[in-house]
């Protein structure tokens, strides 16, 4: 437990637990929310289906735990003084699951980092964590069908599975520097998310 009693203003950046910090009535708590917990709300069954624990007989206790987590997520959100969301989509999720209004402030991007090149490469790019909820598998299926060149930058537990379903037009890059990301972003035909 963090001791935040000496601060008048608490700002949290949260997709799960940071917004749940306990504050006093004298403190103002502003939370920048990336999403209400997906695994406790609309994507619970997707996460359960993909969980190794549910495959070995733990689905019921996990489901019970996720329902309790959903309750906590809701009640902890009600203690926030002001909510900022990172997108219109997240704002709708906050309204739906927490019943709260939020102001949208998109994450900042220093666009000067990305030098536009007149000579574009003949490839598309995706920058992602390779996890189930990002649905990179759908992107791969589309690019397999279109046979267009795609570079996927990122890593995660789904990488090997995604590499197996990819045709030769799709290339994976892991752990590359920010400078290399900038180079690919400035040369690609389009960014795909």
Question: What kind of feature is each model-predicted range?
Answer:
Residues 186-193:
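Acidic donor-binding loop of glycosyltransferase active sites
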